[in-house]
Amino acid sequence: MIDRSGPALVHAWLGAMYLDGADGLIGWIDLDPAVRPPRDNGSRDVEIVLETGALEPGPVLDAHVGACAARIRDALERLPGLTRYALEHAPAGWAGYYAGQPGPPLPDRLFLDGIRVSEQLLVSLDFDAGELDQLTLRLGHEGAAERVFLTP
């Protein structure tokens, strides 16, 4: 449950981050349309979820959030290539099904909806293609694309 009574911390780039349960933070950043087109309603936000474990507010948590922000920025700088990787390595049948649906080409429909960073600083990019399931791309410790899977 998100505690919206006030931010748990405010990061210089990520902005206000709110408690998300006992071991996480959640926030939203606006992305430049050059990085990712806005949502259908014009909103430029992307959800950011950071796993923090049992870290208490203070310098250690601040350092963790800073490291998460650096990982997110790195992934966003490489977003076009990571998006291609996600499409090329999507589960069998998934890309074929979506490519056959009416509308723009699949690469243009794959929409970065959220970014998660684990306690171990592993980044996951959650892409929406307009249906219920999301296509998730997990990056490894060095930031390279590692695994693509569906999440409900």
Identify the residue ranges that each predicted region occupies:
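Amphipathic protein-protein interaction modules
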Residues: 63-130
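N-terminal "domain-start" segment
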Residues: 1-87
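Acidic, proline/glycine-rich low-complexity IDRs
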Residues: 1-29, 33-39, 101-152
